[in-house]
Structures are given as structure tokens and as C-alpha cells.
Swiss-Prot record:
One of its GO terms (cellular component) is nucleus. The gene is okr. The modification Phosphothreonine is found at T22. This is DNA repair and recombination protein RAD54-like. CDD domains: DEXHc_RAD54A, SF2_C_SNF. SMART domains: DEXDc (SM00487), HELICc (SM00490).
Amino acid sequence: MRRSLAPSQRGPLRPESRHSFTPPLLKKNKRSCQQELEREQELDRKRQSALRDASNTLELPLPIRFTANSEYERAIAKVLARKFKVPMDNYVPDYGGKRVLGVRRCISRRPLHDPVACNALVLFHPPAYTEHERMGMDPSKVLVHVVVDPLLSNILRPHQREGVRFMYECVEGKRGNFNGCIMADEMGLGKTLQCVTLVWTLLRQGPECKPTINKAIVVSPSSLVKNWEKEFTKWLQGRLLCLPMEGGTKENTIRALEQFSMTSSRLGTPVLLISYETFRIYAEILCKYEVGMVICDEGHRLKNSDNLTYQALMGLKTKRRVLLSGTPIQNDLTEYYSLVNFVNPEMLGTAAVFKRNFESAILRGQNTDSTDAERQRAIAKTQELIGLVDQCIIRRTNQILTKYLPVKFEMVICAKLTSIQLELYTNFLKSDQVRRSLADCKEKASLTALADITTLKKICSHPNLIYEKITARDKGFENSQNVLPSNYNAKDLNPELSGKFMLLDFMLAAIRADGNDKVVLISNYTQTLDLFEQLARKRKYGFVRLDGTMSIKKRSKVVDRFNDPESDSFLFMLSSKAGGCGLNLIGANRLFMFDPDWNPANDEQAMARVWRDGQKKPCYIYRLVASGSIEEKILQRQTHKKSLSSTIIDNNESAEKHFTRDDLKDLFTFDADILSDTHDKLKCKRCVQNIQMKPPPEDTDCTSHLSQWYHCSNNRGLPDNILAQAWMDCKCVSFVFHHRSQAQEIVASAEEAASEQPEEKPDRRKRPSTPLSDDSADEDFLGF
């Protein structure tokens, strides 16, 4: 660009022209301009002819002379005509699109992230087109790769990458003609992170080079709404804003939900986090408009298709449905059908068709009096059902975690009943109350029988739990007042009156004295938590307690305070029914499961609170049962695995209702001299007179069947010195089963683990299985 000169840069003007400037266009007319142009053209022709001579050489002032047609000129021309080539061997253009210079926008489609980058997780691969096919295609309709954001793909572990890919294929209809799936991974495998990855990917990209969905809804228990918000913020680092529905007035809630539902695109908060209860109340608003996808956390809440929450969620206008549950099957096939039908309606037909085709045949084959033909038909129908649901269910066990977490030791401790407990227990079994309960039962347990079972469980824990029944001379305790000591005081806990409490008291004292380990105490009854509190105050232990009475907001603060290493809280008292799911208690590395639940899923959920991501110490899990009592019967029910298929699990919160009269007779039996009723029924071939002569197979661990664990009738060989010392001191332990997890292989962080082993093929099991899934053990487990 020409720049005008400043006055100081110009030379002196002539006097006569100082004030007589005339524009050039006015000095020359049109004719003179034409003449000047012709003159210039003539000079150019003469200049060119003067440069040529007879030898066709160019005269240059340089000393070099060469011909225009020389080999050198041709070589230079060939080099200049060569197309540009990327100086990398075997390089393939990343997106295959054309590039244009300047400000004009390229119309060819490109994926959001590089599919050939290191550690890239590609969920969709477009068809491979030849160059000839590309020439005839509309560039605006070419499909592109769907690539997970590197922010997430670089931290996903191998099994999590597989889970994200599986869910994407399901919701996009790549696995049949359905768009739903069930993520049935066990606790601690990162189901939340996998769902965050799926939602973020669908909100930002798709094969059509545009977002697949505009908004999503995450439905969870009210205690986990805040946790979901934290997870989105943690993994996406604030890149996505969520709309959590917790608290607030009714007017504000309605306004927020209407704005979320009515906005179709460019929504500031495209993810709604809402509890099951709130969704049911405001379902009319949320079901008016379409939504891209719905995720249901703790999805086993939808096992009853007749409840209002299930029906409200079924009315949601979306085809993409993801259900999260570590325990997708908790009772029978009807509940299992409800879950599958929620994510993929009509996959299994109507309820009547499903019952006729599958349920009736399978249940007939499970009866003890079924014929061989009925059992074979049941097996065939079970395999047919598995083949159908395999395409929409993925399940991995926490066996995968063993390579990332410190070692875990699990121990099932059989504690003897004290003399007072023993007398109360046997007197109640011999009472007219139990005799009438058994007489009233014909095919199923009566309500009185179920109440008697609860009474026996309380006797096993501590006499304080039935003190009111004793003083009131309740049925079964008419003559039990003399059993208690004369100075008995229910308000002042005496651990010596209970074998389990005596053992717990000894072990807590040893743990407190030997180091800085923290402990989680879990029970199914809040009354037992009250006894824990009395013990903690008696021994002056710092503690926190979480049960159903605690508000949702306060729970998070309590957990954070306990996990703080500087906190003086030694004990965390937890009700398994109130807070067994979603809690991360890695501040502790020792956990006592004080009483067993009929549903093994509840116990597994609760016991997984300490052995999870972030844990740095070896973990010790203690499961306490009273020797020979109903608690051992419950343990046996938990470990029982039906012979037909691991798809059908015999575990339910109200499993007692399915007991036959013969089952109840077995529950109301007791042998005071037995070391372990469970070990006797195993008919263990590795033990002689309750002494282990042969160790378990090398390839077993704490996920194996109890018959494949270590069996100890004394304190030698125990993995925990504290338990070994308590066995000697309190002399209330009769038998111990113990095993450990596989040794930790990867000490690196999750990010490093994911990047170091991208090629690993994790253990993948699509169909749900029992917690103890060693098929070879069933042959020895004859008594169950």
C-alpha cells in the first residue's frame, strides 16, 4: 500500500507551483491518454525483441549463461509442478475432507475430535468410501466419526470404555431394533462416570455432525441428586451445567421444569437431575414434550410395573432409556420382566405372553417335585430368555477392581451365643408361640412366623433388643424374666451379654490402640445402631451416625467430615436400608456387618462402601453371625444359587414370605454345640473334623463360593492379627471363613491405568449373576 509523504519528507516546492496545483485528469484529455498507452505498448514490444538474439540466449548482467530449454530448467519446472506431500510415512489425512483457503467456510463435515489420536475412543465409524464414491456424494450428507471427548477418554479404564461403547450402541439402535439398555455393573465400577461420558457425547455430537440429543433427564433417589451434580462437575470440569431439582418452592419447581421441557435447543442446563418422588409429582409437565434420553439410577426401584413412579416414567416421550442397577434381579421373573420392559418395551412381549412363554415353564422346573421333562424345558426356556436379554444387558463384577485397589480381606465370623442368649433362644423355640406359628403355616409363612423370625434375629444381636418383650411377658417370653441378671439395666449396655457385641468391643479397642484405622459399623436395625452409640459413648469413641432420619443435605456433610483424615471420628454407624447405596466411605478401611439381611444385594451394597476408588489401605470386612442360629440360615440362603440359571437369583427383601412349611421348620432348629452349621452343610472335603487339611485352589478369591474359602476352627492362619488376638481374649469365636481379593496389579492413578492398558479386554458378563458364582461349588453345597 502506497503511503503519502509527510510535509517534512517532501522537497521544496517550486514558487510557481506552490499554489497552482491542477489535478492530473484535468491536465490530459482522453486522446492524450490513449496515445500515451500506445507508446508504452510499443516500448514493451521493442524491449522484448531486443533481448533475443540469433542463438536464442538471454543476455543478463550476471556471469551465468544458460539456455531456456536446458535440463536444469526442466528439472526446476518438474519440482515446482510437484504436489505437496506431508513429510510423514504412511500418513492418512485425518478426516478425508477438502481444505479451502481464505474466509470461505469448508462445507465438508468433520468430527468433533480426532479419531486417530492417541487413546481415542471412537463410538461410531462411518462407512469407508472410495475417492470415486466421494466425488458423487453431497459433502453435507457425509457421516462422520463419533469420538469421545479426550477429557474423558483419557481417564476411562478399559472396562469403562467398553461400557460406554455398549450403551452408545444400545441407545442408537445398533443392537437390534431397541434403544434401551441395563447397566448392571456391580458397585464401584464407575457406572456414573460411564453415564456422564455417554450424556456428554450425545449432547455434543453425532454421525450427522450435529448433537444426537438436546437434553437428558437423570432420575435417582433423592439422596443421590446432589451426588450426580458433583459427578458432572468433577469429570467435565464445569463444561456442562445441570439443573438439580432439590428443595425449592412448588412455584419455582414448576417454572424450572416447564422451561426445561418447552425449550428444544440451546438450553443452558440440558441435563435435569431429579428424584423419583419429584418426577412422579410433576410427571404431567415432564411428559408433555420429547426428551433425548432418560437415565434411571438405582433402577431396581422400578421392579413393580404397577406403581405410580413406573407408570410416570413410562409416559416420558423418549426411546433412549438407560437403567443402572448393581442388582437388577432381586426376587422373581415378574420383576425382571418389569425392568427389561421399561428400557425396551415389547422386547419380551406383554406380561401375559411373557408369563405363558417363560415364567410358568421356568417356575415349574424349579419345584422340588418337578419331572425331568419339566426341568429340561425350564433350562431351555431360561437359555432362550438369556439370549433375548443379552443384547441389552451388560454386567461386570468388581473382580475388575482388584488390579486397581489395595487387597481386601473378607471374613465370616461365627460367634457363640452367651449363656443368657442361649437360654432366651432355646426357650423361645420351645414356646407355644413358635409351635402355633408352624401349625398356622400351610404353604407359605404366616405373619406371626415372620415376626418370630425377627425376634430370633434380635436375640442373636443382644438381649437389650427384646427387653420390652421380656418385661411385658410377651408371647414366647412368659418365663424369661428370671433369665436376665438381677442388676440388669437396659440403658447401660453390657457387651458381655452378647457374643457378637463382646467380640466387637474387643476388636474396636485393639483397632483404636494399634493405629489410625477408622471403622464402619452396619446394621439392618436402627435399634442396633442405638446400642452402637451406647458402646461408643461408654468407650469414649468419636462417631457419626447415618440412618433414615437424617436429611439429604446433612448426609453429605457427615460423610465428608468422616473421610477427613484430621477428623476425630473413629466410627461411622450406618443403617444399610437408609444409606447403603451411593456412599463413599474410603476414610475407613475396616467394616463390620453386624447382622445379615435376607437380600444379599443389601449386604453387598453396604459392604462396598470402603473398598472402592480412592482407598489407599488394605481393607478388612467382618461379617458376624451367631453360631448355629437363624443368622447362619440367612447366610446359607444368601449363598444359595439356583441350579437352573444365574439369571434368576433367590434374594428378596421379603424372601421370608416364600418359605414353605419345611423351610420354616429348618429355620426354627438350633444346635448349641455346633461350631458352624454352614460349614457342616458344606460337607467340606478339605477339612477333617473341622480342621483344614488342604488349602483352597490357587485361582480362588473372596468372590468364590464359601466352600472355596479358608476354613478355621482356631486362630492360626488368620489374615488379621486383631481378630486372632480377640479370638484368644474373649473366647467367643467358634469358626471363621476367610479369603482375600486378588493382589493389586496397578498402583497408578485411573488416568494412568487407562492410558497404559488401552488394549486390555476386561472380564465382561452381560447376564446378572449371584454374588457367589462358582459353578463348581454347587456340587458340594448339598444342604442349601
